[in-house]
Design a protein with these regions (language model features):
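Non-catalytic structural scaffold of enzyme domains
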Residues: 2-287
Length: 287
């Protein structure tokens, strides 16, 4: 078993992998988009599932966790970091950007594309409480909302439910209906999925709303932004380099990450989790 201590050993910085971090499993939706748009790149994914959801945590905790995991990834040679968590981006990316020497890409609720998509000029935003209360979110509303009214709905309970692997149970559908029906009653025709976990609810939302809401998911936009950042810093992988399978790490036992990654990443991709951590709270995959 090789050591995971340095992803970039014996290779150029450009050939090193990109780090991806989320509070849990939601960032796998971003990883899927990144692999589709940048198939030659390699990726290292960290799910902080032991501490999910971040949306109910205070700002200091979110900053501490994001910085700790970002430093862990940077120290092991990742060439860039995608903070694939709306809550972590909203509350901590400015601090983390100052501390880390590698380029960062964050995720934000798709307020601008929702404004462009909405014909009724009423749109819903489903996000964590921490995202909705953040100054970064308010800035997006001020910059892009224009004449469009945004209905803000904290998605209490959704991340925990998705982390358990539930995306369509009767209880989940009832919870979602309670969030979505007031939006429809208010005339919303567009819904911003303001958490990277929520794209896993895409089909259930469409069924509950009879496809009356245009869903805004920013995963593909994140992939385009990462491509631009790698270009700007001369960090695109050298031509002819074969992408390696993603390395996946979890702060819980990794079983849910393994199951969901195998289903989402396709091609028979398998995640193996080693139960013996080499540092506090970390469970590492076999390599």
């Amino acid at each position: 078993m090789s050591s995971p201590s340095d992803f970039a050993s014996e290779e150029s910085t450009a050939a090193a992998p990109v780090g991806i971090f989320d509070s849990g499993l939601g960032g796998l939706s971003v990883l899927r988009a990144l692999r589709a748009q940048l198939p030659e790149e390699s990726f290292v994914y960290v799910a902080d599932s032991r501490h999910a959801p971040y949306g109910e945590r205070d700002d200091a905790f979110i900053i501490e966790r994001t910085l700790a995991i970002g430093e862990w990834l940077a120290a092991r040679g990742t060439k860039a970091l995608v903070v694939a968590c709306n809550t972590a981006t909203a509350q901590s990316i400015a601090v983390v950007r100052e501390k880390l020497a590698i380029p960062l890409v964050g995720v934000e609720p798709g307020i601008k594309p929702a404004t462009l998509a909405s014909r009724s000029r009423v749109a819903g935003v489903l996000a964590t409480a921490a995202t909705l209360r953040s100054a970064r979110f308010e800035s997006l509303i001020e910059r892009y909302a224009a004449d469009c009214r945004f209905l803000r709905q904290p998605g209490h309970g959704l991340v925990e439910t998705i982390e358990r692997g539930d995306t369509s149970s009767p209880a989940l559908r009832a919870l979602l209906a309670g969030y979505l029906e007031p939006m429809l009653a208010a005339g919303a025709d567009t819904l911003v999925l303001g958490c990277t976990h929520y794209p896993f609810l895409d089909m259930t939302i469409r069924e509950l709303t009879q496809a009356r809401l245009t869903l805004i998911d920013t995963s593909e936009a994140i992939a385009r932004q990462l491509a631009r950042v790698l270009d700007e810093h001369g960090l695109h992988v050298p031509t002819g380099t074969a992408a390696r399978p993603p390395h996946l790490y979890s702060t819980d036992d990794g079983s849910r990450l393994q199951a969901l990654a195998a289903a989402l990443l396709g091609g028979g991709f398998k995640v193996e989790v080693q139960q013996k951590p080499v540092a506090p709270e970390w469970h590492l995959p076999r390599q």
